[in-house]
Amino acid sequence: MYKRQIDWRGDLDLTQDPFNEVDSLILSTVSYIDFELIETDLKTEKATIREAGEQFNRLHADEKIKAGRLVPDSIFRLLDVMSRTPRFRDMILSDYVNQIDEEEEKQFSAITINLGDGSYYIAYRGTDDTIVGWKEDFNMSFKAPVPSQLQALDYLEMIAKKKRGKFRIGGHSKGGNIAVYAAAFTGSEIQKRIMQVHNFDGPGFTKDIIDQMSQGEISERIRTIVPQSSVIGMLLEHEESYEVVASTQLGIFQHDMFSWQLQRNAFVKVDDISASAYKVDHTLREFILSMNAEEKEEFVESFFCVLTETGAKTLSDLNLKEILAIMKRLNKEEKENKKILTQAFRMLLKIPTKKQL
């Protein structure tokens, strides 16, 4: 999908074809790249997208780098294509942050991109392959705020102090959630500098957080875009409305941003999410609402205890034998718990149900 967009519009810079929603998703997707795999230390230095792409290709030409179980490996091909197109190649990457803290139960990563038109794009990474990252996602159901939301706010305010000019903010999955959180909770002076916020299939918030949000005028600049069969993006509460994009995939696989359909410089939109997405959303929502905060915490601890007992740090660490053992263990749970736990585990590993095949 992205290659088609870059092939169509990649020869046009932002003065010839203004920044659009597909550009925003492409740049938010860049946040999934592990920039510690290139020579330039983007935590303290800068590099253009062209330089980053060239360094990556030179250092890893003979390797098959895996992005993890949930992030498509084509993410690295995207960097290569971007590095060779006038639209993206001279954009400057900087202020890379990548933090995993098991004790704090935090997974956070972000990067800032100088667009070259006097504005910056802050890209927040969504949940990656780490088990601690997914536990933080589940913690959102009973804990507010979670560490990555606070870190996203700190990062925005740090960048706003360092850089002059306007900002666009975006992220996919949890990255979209923390982008909205940062924009909504920062001060009015920084909010005035935010041009737009994109939440691409990111989960919503607990009612406590929504009640605290001082979105004000910034709410008019927040756009939430989800695929037809959105599961992740329908979790928890959304105060803002959302737009629905067509996807070439089915079910939970539509969370893969590479499957979203586009026409020229915009997404192909549909009227609403699918009936199956409504059903999954209703099931999960009813289950979440049926428990108090203490019960939710106990449920999350129970679920992730099953995963961490294997010794795995990432979902990719789980081999077939361990996956089958986990499924067997989940089958011993009480009927209602078993249904939700199994659904959650399938979601994490992108294991389709018979209805999705």
Language model features with spans:
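Alpha/beta hydrolase fold serine-hydrolase catalytic domain that processes acyl esters and thioesters
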Residues: 3-120, 124-139, 143-166, 187-357
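Gly/Ala-rich beta-loop-alpha elbow adjacent to hydrolase catalytic centers
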Residues: 170-175, 179
